[in-house]
Every structure is written in structure tokens, then in C-alpha cells.
Design a protein with these regions (language model features):
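Outer-membrane beta-barrel translocator/channel fold
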Residues: 66-85, 111-115, 147-156
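Cleavable N-terminal export/targeting peptides
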Residues: 1-28
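Outer-membrane beta-barrel strand-turn architecture
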Residues: 55-59, 98-102, 136-140, 175
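Short glycine/proline- and aromatic-enriched beta-strand/turn motifs that initiate or cap beta-hairpins
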Residues: 20-75, 90, 104, 114, ...
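Helix-adjacent hinge/juxtasegments
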Residues: 81-103, 107
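Outer-membrane beta-barrel "beta-signal"
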Residues: 134-138, 143, 163-175
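Outer-envelope exported proteins of Gram-negative bacteria
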Residues: 52-54, 64-66, 91-95, 107-111, ...
Length: 175
């Protein structure tokens, strides 16, 4: 089931990205790079980067795609052992953007997320991610983005479902 979810989500994201030719002259694109931070209920706080592209397909609507990579480690200690857990988080999301005016637009995204943990062994979990945010363009070629990103994963243990919630802040170039 997880592999089907990952394959389907990845296919949708890649087809969406391919459907938006960023080399077109008539429509604007905004590439942004920024800081991302997320907190998982089992792996602690993760920090990393987010790369995004917003392609304006019409005067009001666009397509936003993003890739996030976050990393973190956390010490643990219990009755039987102690050590450090290293966690990596990858997301590939896509969705629509709505241009409210020349300076402000909103976006939402969905797509696959991979959480990779290393302790005594390796454990990977596939889930789905979702994101929403705002992009502010104070001048014609610069954009500032602020967004929320969350993810849900299937639990492989008895302590409940694994999820993450975080934010991202980026600066982009619009052309």
C-alpha cells in the first residue's frame, strides 16, 4: 500500500512539473530557496532546506512544486539501551497557487514524503505530505515565501501514528 501511495504521488508530482514548461516567455516563474524546520512526534526537531518553483500558467493561477530535505538527531536513553537516532526527511510536493494581486499569492500542495531513521538499524517510512503558504513579492523580481508543511506516516510500532508539523521561510527570484 505504501509503495502504491508513493508511486502514485510521485507520478502526479512529476507529471504536474512536466506540464509546466518553465522556459515559456509569456508566464513568470519564481524559484526560491529557504529554511525549513519540522517537529516529529517521535524523532524530535528536524532542520533543513526547501527548494520551490512557482510557475504562473495564467494571470490568476499557477503550479507550485517543492522539494524539502531536513535532518536531525536526538539522544535517547531507556532501561535497555541508550544512543542516538539520526533522522532524514524528504518531501516532493506539488499543487496550485492562486495570485490574489501582483504582490500576494497563496499556494497548497500534496505529495509523497520519506522519513529515514538510523539507530541500530535502518527504518524508512513513506507517507503523504501537505503544505500551504503565502508568497509576497515586494518588488517585481524578489519573492518571500512563508508556509506550513505537515506529513502523516503509517505507524510500524504500538505507540501510535507518526506525524510531523513544521514551517518554511524562503527568498526567491522571480523572472
Amino acid at each position: 500500500m505504501n509503495k502504491m501511495l508513493l508511486a502514485g504521488s510521485t507520478g502526479i508530482v512529476l507529471l504536474s512539473a512536466a506540464a509546466s514548461p518553465v522556459w515559456a516567455d509569456d508566464n513568470a516563474s519564481t524559484f526560491s530557496l529557504g529554511y525549513a524546520q519540522s517537529h516529529t512526534n517521535h524523532a524530535g526537531t528536524l532542520r533543513g532546506v526547501r527548494l520551490a518553483n512557482n510557475y504562473e500558467m495564467s494571470p490568476d493561477w499557477g503550479l507550485t512544486t517543492s522539494f524539502a530535505w531536513l535532518n536531525g538527531s536526538q539522544r535517547y536513553s531507556d532501561e535497555s539501551s541508550n544512543g542516538r537516532v539520526t533522522t532524514r526527511y524528504y518531501s516532493l510536493l506539488a499543487g496550485p497557487s492562486w495570485k490574489i494581486n501582483n504582490q500576494l499569492s497563496l499556494y497548497s500542495q500534496v505529495g509523497p514524503v520519506l522519513l529515514h531513521q538510523r539507530d541500530h538499524g535502518i527504518d524508512s517510512k513513506v507517507g503523504y505530505g501537505y503544505s500551504a503558504g503565502v508568497a509576497y513579492t515586494p518588488v517585481s523580481s524578489v519573492a518571500i515565501t512563508l508556509g506550513y508543511e505537515g506529513a502523516d506516516f503509517d505507524a510500524t510500532h504500538n505507540s501510535g501514528s507518526l506525524n510531523s508539523n513544521g514551517f518554511n521561510l524562503g527568498v526567491g527570484y522571480r523572472f
